[in-house]
């Protein structure tokens, strides 16, 4: 294939499909992490293209905290059924028994127990030796320095000083028993690339990405959408209907919306063309402390 004849989106598509096929051929038990967001939707679309007309040679895994938006759960189940994918859902049973939640225990503890520990439990339970993730280098500085094949030790830890060279399109997937690789096929994509590709390929996404009147309250400089009756209202807080959408999706008490009138994909793309902030500004977990994402990744987070 002559890459010079491809548009930049088709070049990114070809690179991602190549990576996905390499992992499927090289590893004995891969899995695709499915967080239900826009990047997961693009990654799943690319995987289906990579093996069309066959089915995916690996399952999808959703590490569930119990605090995702209701529309995300509906979209997850509908998508898995429509595409005939094997969907594995894991919740940390110890965290559930302790009633861990973001309101009482805070974002750092909630994320560590329900997401990081939950992820490690699931990877160990099923014995996965490679796990696809939808992270991109433009999202956040610790992800910017991570390889496409991200080596993890037997405790699932990431050491940024112990990474393997990736020359051209050659990836080193050699691991010992108990070790694993996190694979990021979308590493070289930007947020704008993602939206342009979603528009180009008509990929289905969670409606929360499109602007609509939603019940929100202001807290710590963020707009939190009230998704169910578990909200812990603080003195002076008022729930009001505002026109908002989400640039990133996670646990609803930890994910901020943005004021927006973008109700269509072209309107979202127009917003991205003039945006000067990262989509991660809407994630409370990224504000826990300086370098919080890198610390979480060192402990086993995606």
Curated annotation (Swiss-Prot):
Pfam families: PAPS_reduct (PF01507). GO terms for biological process: hydrogen sulfide biosynthetic process; sulfate assimilation. Its EC number is 2.7.7.4. One of its GO terms (molecular function) is ATP binding. It comes from the Bacteria. Pathway: Sulfur metabolism; hydrogen sulfide biosynthesis; sulfite from sulfate: step 1/3. It catalyses: sulfate + ATP + H(+) = adenosine 5'-phosphosulfate + diphosphate. It is an enzyme of class 2 (transferase). Keywords: ATP-binding, Nucleotide-binding, Nucleotidyltransferase, Transferase. With CysN forms the ATP sulfurylase (ATPS) that catalyzes the adenylation of sulfate producing adenosine 5'-phosphosulfate (APS) and diphosphate, the first enzymatic step in sulfur assimilation pathway. APS synthesis involves the formation of a high-energy phosphoric-sulfuric acid anhydride bond driven by GTP hydrolysis by CysN coupled to ATP hydrolysis by CysD. PANTHER family: SULFATE ADENYLYLTRANSFERASE SUBUNIT 2. Heterodimer composed of CysD, the smaller subunit, and CysN. Belongs to the PAPS reductase family. CysD subfamily. This is Sulfate adenylyltransferase subunit 2.
């Amino acid at each position: 294939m002559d890459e010079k004849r491809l548009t930049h989106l088709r070049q990114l598509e070809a690179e991602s499909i190549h990576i996905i096929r390499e992992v499927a051929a090289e590893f004995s038990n891969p899995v695709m992490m499915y967080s239900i967001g826009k990047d997961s939707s693009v990654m799943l679309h690319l995987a289906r293209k990579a093996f069309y007309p066959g089915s995916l040679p690996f399952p999808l895994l959703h590490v569930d905290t119990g605090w995702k938006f209701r529309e995300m759960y509906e979209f997850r189940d509908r998508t898995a059924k429509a595409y005939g994918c094997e969907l594995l859902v894991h919740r940390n049973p110890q965290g559930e028994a302790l009633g861990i939640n973001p309101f009482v225990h805070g974002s750092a503890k909630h994320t560590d127990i329900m997401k990081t520990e939950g992820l490690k439990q699931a990877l160990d339970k099923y014995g996965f030796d490679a796990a696809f993730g939808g992270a991109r280098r433009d999202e956040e500085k610790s992800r910017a320095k991570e390889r496409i094949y991200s080596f993890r030790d037997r405790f699932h830890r990431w050491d940024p000083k112990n990474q393997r060279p990736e020359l051209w399109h050659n990836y080193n997937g050699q691991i010992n028993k108990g070790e694993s690789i996190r694979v990021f096929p979308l590493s070289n994509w930007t947020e704008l690339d993602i939206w342009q590709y979603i528009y180009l390929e008509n990929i289905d996404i969670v409606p929360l990405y499109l602007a609509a009147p939603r019940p929100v309250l202001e807290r710590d400089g963020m707009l939190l959408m009230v998704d169910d009756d578990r909200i812990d209202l603080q003195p002076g807080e008022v729930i009001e209907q505002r026109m908002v959408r989400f640039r990133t999706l996670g646990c609803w008490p930890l994910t901020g919306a943005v004021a927006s009138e973008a109700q269509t994909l072209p309107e979202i793309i127009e917003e991205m063309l003039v945006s000067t902030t990262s989509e991660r500004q809407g994630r409370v977990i990224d504000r826990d402390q300086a370098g919080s994402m890198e610390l979480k990744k060192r402990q086993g987070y995606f």
